[in-house]
């Protein structure tokens, strides 16, 4: 373990703003502002202030520069000057992840706006409320291939929940209020607001609150009672039910209701990658995460179930495996606020469209009214599942070459930082190990890019989470591949006084790609060696120091606990720990892409035969 080299203290450390006491949907504030004549840019800033925004992540540029002038005078808005627009988008997403409030990012036209495409697609796929404000060339230049012109509305139409091109300054308050409402209501998502430069520079009439005009947008939040009653009947008749829980339970603030339903009925629970923390890992009914790298018990529960109670989940291919062999004997209750998700991948015997908290609350009342909980017979089912859980627990062994095990590092980090910390992962092996070996007890304590699988997500998302929760310990768990995509945002953290901590799982490779090459391409390791082991290029400790962080390195198991505690003791600047781990470590269990969940391997060459586990039930 190398000794830390502490960089000079940053010269500028603004106090972080806390979002703890802000309303989740501040657009509903009753405050009225009389008519005023402002520039369009001033109207943007005033609207954001009235909407309760406290932080914006962005970079100025020509087309959006008019907004930055009144921003300079705002006493309510903190602006975080990121080093790349992708960082702004992911930081806004991280902020929204942990608070449930809308995250805001801002960029100029052309390349500034196009650099937001990936984070907007990421937020949309994972149902994260984000509003991006982009400058655009003047209205008279649109369509002329003007300098830094890009049709960002057209580009982002397929990857956002909605987007706007503002054509009149008078529309700015209404459009921004609508954007926030759309982003945060129903199924949350990403919204883009594109504003031409001449609209920002021109005069407009400002008043607040504006009258929103969204006649075609009415999310159905109240579930149909008849459907809930039918769901209760299926639950009463089931003998092998499973609560299949997705990220919508967290987005819908329904985790307490989920626990009440689970404990009332005694039904086993599986939580998808996006739902880790929705149900406590310490709870005896929690079977863990299902899917490609899920627990054998969770996968077995879905495959052998006779009833799936799917709550706020979308039957993603990484959970279902080969769809026509997924849960072949199960009937399906599918509750989701987005009607487009119901029946999209799996037929629902009882579809329920509505807010998941309302669905669960009404379902609990229905079950109690009909005295159903005491009639569900699941002794054999639980005996079977406990047998699977006992036979195939999540585990890992030492590396054959004696190198540091990444699973050990992540497991120890989770134990030491504890359930009150927030963990943010990039994408790849380290993401899966963090999902598997850290025990999540609370919602919004686990952030990752689940749907889009965006490398480079962790550092900027952790930055956004730390700004939202300045009193919470925030760890970015990143791989050496992901880290090299967005590590420049550590300079932002150092300058802005955002003391995130980074556990860098450095295996010298694009680890997940290398694992697939090992399993499916005869160990032909084409273009996956990053040279971060063989040449130490870059030297991550030196890089961390150059970015204004403390840099640490750990290569031995006996040093892991000490170096984590050393990092935890540093709270005035960011810290990066370069964990040198084995290059050949692999993520298990695994269901190969495109195959049936029945073909899960607990470890390489070890395939559980679910029907042979006969402790009480086959």
Swiss-Prot record:
Molecular function via GO: acetolactate synthase activity; flavin adenine dinucleotide binding; magnesium ion binding; thiamine pyrophosphate binding
Superkingdom of this protein's organism: Bacteria
pH dependence: Optimum pH is between 6 and 7.
GO BP field: branched-chain amino acid biosynthetic process; isoleucine biosynthetic process; L-valine biosynthetic process
Keywords: Amino-acid biosynthesis, Branched-chain amino acid biosynthesis, FAD, Flavoprotein, Magnesium, Metal-binding, Thiamine pyrophosphate, Transferase
GO cellular component terms, semicolon-separated: acetolactate synthase complex; peptidoglycan-based cell wall
Pathway assigned to this chain's UniProt record: Amino-acid biosynthesis; L-isoleucine biosynthesis; L-isoleucine from 2-oxobutanoate: step 1/4; Amino-acid biosynthesis; L-valine biosynthesis; L-valine from pyruvate: step 1/4
Catalytic reaction list: 2 pyruvate + H(+) = (2S)-2-acetolactate + CO2
Temperature dependence: Optimum temperature is between 35 and 40 degrees Celsius.
Cofactor(s) in the UniProt record: Mg(2+); thiamine diphosphate
EC assignment: 2.2.1.6
PROSITE patterns associated with the record: TPP_ENZYMES
Keyword DNA repair: no
Co-factor: note: Binds 1 Mg(2+) ion per subunit.
Residue numbers spanned by region Disordered: 1-30
Binding site for Mg(2+): 480, 507
Entry binding sites for FAD: 187, 293-314, 336-355
Disruption phenotype: Auxotrophic for all of the 3 branched-chain amino acids (isoleucine, leucine and valine), when grown with either C6 or C2 carbon sources. Depletion of these branched chain amino acids in the medium led to loss of viability.
Sites where the protein binds thiamine diphosphate: 85
The protein's assembly and partners: Heterodimer of large catalytic subunit and small regulatory subunit.
Described purpose of this protein according to its UniProt entry: Catalyzes the conversion of 2 pyruvate molecules into acetolactate in the first common step of the biosynthetic pathway of the branched-amino acids such as leucine, isoleucine, and valine. Also involved in condensing pyruvate and 2-ketobutyrate to form 2-aceto-2-hydroxybutyrate.
Family: Belongs to the TPP enzyme family.
Protein's recorded name: Acetolactate synthase large subunit IlvB1
Organism: Mycobacterium tuberculosis (strain ATCC 25618 / H37Rv)
